[in-house]
Amino acid sequence: MAVFTVNGKTVTAEKNQKLLRFLRDELRLTSVKDGCSEGACGTCTVLIDGKPTKACVPQTDKLEGKTILTVEGLSDWEREVYTWAFGEAGAVQCGFCIPGMVISAKALLDTNPDPSREEAAFAIRNNICRCTGYVKIIDGILLAAKCFREGKLPEAPVDWKVGSRVHRVDVAEKVTGTGQYPDDIYLDGMLYGSAVRSQHPRARVLAIHTEEAKALPGVVCVLTAADIPGSNKVGHLKKDWDTMIAVGDITHYLGDAICLVAAETPEALAQAKALVKVDYEELPAVHNPQEAILPDAPLVHREGNLLAHKHIQRGNPAEALAKSKYLITRRFSTPWTEHAFLEPECAVACPDGDGVLVLSTDQGAYDTQHEIMGMLGLPAEQVKVRNCLVGGGFGGKEDVTVQHHAALIAYLTKRPVKVKLTRAESLLIHPKRHPMEMEFSLGCDENGIIQGVAAECIADTGAYASLGGPVLERACTHGAGPYQYEAYEIDGWAYYTNNPPAGAFRGFGVTQTCFCIETLLNEMADKVGISPWEIRYRNAIRPGGVLPNGQIVDDSTGLIETLEAVKPYYDEAVKNGDPVGLACAMKNAGVGVGIPDTGRVRLVVREGKLHIFAGASCIGQGLGTVLVQTVCGETGIARPDVVYERSNTWMAPDSGTTSGSRQTLFTGEACIRACQDLKKALEEHSLADLEGQEFYGEYLGKTDPLGADVPNPVSHIAYGYATQLCVLDKDTGRIKQMVAAHDVGKAVNPLSVEGQIEGGVVMSMGYALTERYPIDENCRPTVKFGTLGLFRANQIPEIKPIIVEKPGLNVGGGAIGIGEITSIPTAPAIAEAYRRYDGELRTELPLKNTPYAKK
């Protein structure tokens, strides 16, 4: 037992436990987030006697007489200042790391009221952010310091039209910690659930012994596949993922669930899981695509080890390459990458009449609903899903991980339940970025004009399909780069293995093939005798040009403008003798390739305010703010009269998955269409007069399938374009500056766009230089959150985001999604900078022999 002070009140911790658990589970101080419980991420940072401390480290018995402060204990003035400053700076995206950042900022400003930028960055070095790239968080800390010194707050922006730099709609609840992520929910009678996982990557389950676990006091149920009332199979596109492995069936990877346990307390849950015994017949595993392709390879799935093959061809690349004056062929390798979102997967499910209500953190409420419907054998009206705040996704929360398990327990026990992954489970279970082995050949004429490209790509898609097929397809369609030439051919294969699954990850396969084509183009520039900038300018796709996939691009195409935007920075680096690398990229907005892709919005007038309902997840990218700005701009309704509602499946229409950089364009266009009807009604009525009325908008983006035999095929509604460059310090070899110019069509909220660019650049700096996700001979990841190699605030260089607004797109207000492309050209730009630094051509990520490389 220990007695100490929390937020000015004396408290008693009767049992010895982690401070994090005491603050959250007993005091309900949920601003203190559980991001890893390993002392690595900093989301649980509190002040102990004025010193920032990770609450997941100290035991309560060691805190006798201590004084502890959480965000809930800040003064009203402090909360106002941090909310305004972080909003003004654009420091908040998913928000999961922000309360911990605020506490670290307070520790700094209490002792240093006028810190330098370097001091602010150092103060949050133990707080990881995966969204923002830290730039705007540091800006927010410096703004807060200024407000505290001056004793006043400036006015927040009042112009909420499209194009304005506004505070995000959810900034206050994220800064003060009052917003709810699923793990922040505590309900009367709530159970705690978790899965017992496979001990072998590939083994037949012979028996599951649950008797001892069921007999343990506090255990409510132990469920196996035999208890599932509907289908045991789930899967985002292909139903090949087992909810639980049944007796007699074979495991596919170490993350497979064998059974589910639900108990009254977390302690009873942990004890019960340890009592479950499973008999296995161990079987040979498939470790990589090279093994998967062998004629006598074990089958990961009955239908074979090949998930997908993609072949794309236009023109005759073999002939074009043969006639090229210059030809380069290289092999490339890119690694597994962990999303490392700060919020581990969590869901709370409750019985709801004859069905269930699931409170979730994912990238598509309707996708989750459909998975649960199939598993429980229930119609849509009996399965309700509502998004809470989502603590980052980046593609890693498109597949169900805990939602269906929580739903099953709640449905069968008629009790509410929380199912949450530990950080170790999260690192193992959710799909990662595909590792790829690639070979690219590039041919150019004497002027550096691309004649043709031929390529092959092999991807490890892991244990389950997830989105492996579409990821491979996108890698192939975009492997040609954003250039105009007619001869392109690529073959891609994705193979099942017994490794963790691979699926969607920011960039969706394009990060891998972009690394190849851009690296070759930089090398080719030397052969031709021109600069990397010039070779791109000569080949860049322009309005009216034809991409290698056959699509004629429209007037919104802005690649040239991004090249011109970085030119002064490129020339300055060359003039100063600084090693500089350059790369371009393009990325589609929307699903495209003939697949139905729809955005939907419902506007409802309630109690004199307009409520926005869209079944699209906001995962930190700022969709809610985009829709509010759209409504204010289109209708003239004042910001205080507009309410953004979180996604759900009973009131918000299905707006598709938050993926493919699609929501700003597709759901944004749907919102514009709904606003047009509302605006007509407002010509004759006040908003109050329209009480109870609804206004619906829908936009269907029509595209052509790959290989469609039609004139001028349209693979995607829109593309974003980018040019990034990396400047190294010529003495130290460390990155001095990253410049990122992005064509976004129309920047709805430039503050958010800058934050997306900065965050994407830092994420791919890690991809290029430091991040690792090693897997051992037992198909087990050998990594913890703290050893992933994530960049920290005091390690980032100057980042210069440049917003290029090229008009011409006639949907979505001209806005093109930017969530993915920000991470795509970074790695090849960095690789080229190091080639200029030391002459070494690097074709494998993460890059070797740099000052950032692990010793």
Task: Give residue spans per PLM region.
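Signature of N-terminal electron-transfer/Fe-S-associated modules in redox systems
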Residues: M1-E155, V593
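Short beta-strand elements
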Residues: V46, E173, G179, D183, ...
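Glycine-rich loop/linker segments at domain edges
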Residues: G90, S164, D170-T176, N305-A347, ...
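Flexible, low-hydrophobicity surface segments
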Residues: A145-H309, L327, L412
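C-terminal catalytic domains of large/alpha subunits in multi-subunit enzymes
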Residues: A225-A226, G377-Q382, L412-V417, E446, ...
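Phosphate/diphosphate-binding loops
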Residues: A257, A263-T265, K414-G462, E669-A688
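Helix-loop-helix junctions that connect adjacent transmembrane helices in secondary transporters/permeases
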Residues: L294-L376, A540-K609, C618, E691-V714, ...
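Thiamine diphosphate
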Residues: G393-K414, K418-V419, L623, L627
